A protein has these predicted regions:
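Structural preference for solvent-exposed beta-strand-turn elements
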Residues: 1-196
Length: 196
């Protein structure tokens, strides 16, 4: 089983996170940010990731620090759980519909951190969640995980639906990328011989 546990404590947040890449989609999430809990639960379910997150953050200020630091913790756990990436597919993609919303998500577990984020979110908030924080979450994840991630909105008007499609697509793309490649068992999927 490919798994990792990360603890991250700063003056702003205290996070305990456990991740299993070979899971069933079980999520036990309490971040103090309700909408983020919902999105991470969707990512775990659609990625078949077992994910546990506990976060005590300075949400009396706003949700920024918790959202960003959870992205860092999840990215760190993801990188650790993957190990040397031997035998994985490396690439994953999904075009995911959520009612009128349609979002493309593509990942490369290259070891190089890059985020291309093209979501046009009309609402500044969903519930109490500042929608601009979704980009901060994905940016923090890509930096910590060493992952290239493209998120592109192809259609949609409802901000909740667009974000839901993005997080579900993210889970599905990760699931595909971390899956074993039966044609390359034991091989590192790079002509360089490493993915760092």
């Amino acid at each position: 089983m490919r798994k990792a546990a990360v603890k991250r404590k700063t003056a702003e947040t205290d996070i305990a996170l456990e991740l299993c890449l070979d899971g069933t989609g079980t999520a036990d999430i309490d971040t103090g940010v309700g909408f983020l809990d919902h999105m991470l639960t969707l990512t775990a379910k659609h990625g078949r990731l077992d994910l546990s997150v506990r976060c005590a953050g300075d949400t009396r200020v706003d949700d920024h620090h918790s959202t960003e630091d959870i992205g860092i913790a999840l990215g760190s756990a993801f990188r650790e759980a993957l190990g040397d990436k031997r035998g994985i597919r490396r690439y994953g993609s999904m075009i995911l519909p959520m009612d009128e919303a349609l979002v493309l998500c593509a990942v490369d577990l290259s070891g190089r951190s890059l985020l291309r984020y093209s979501l046009e979110l009309r609402a500044r908030k969903v519930g109490t969640f500042d929608t601009e924080l979704a980009e901060e979450f994905f940016l923090a994840f890509t930096r910590a995980a060493g992952v290239t991630l493209h998120l592109r909105q192809l259609d949609g008007r409802n901000t909740h639906h667009i974000l839901e499609a993005a997080f579900k697509g993210f889970g599905r793309a990760l699931r595909e990328a971390v899956a074993a490649d039966p044609d390359a068992a034991g091989e590192i999927p790079s002509t360089k011989g490493t993915l760092e």
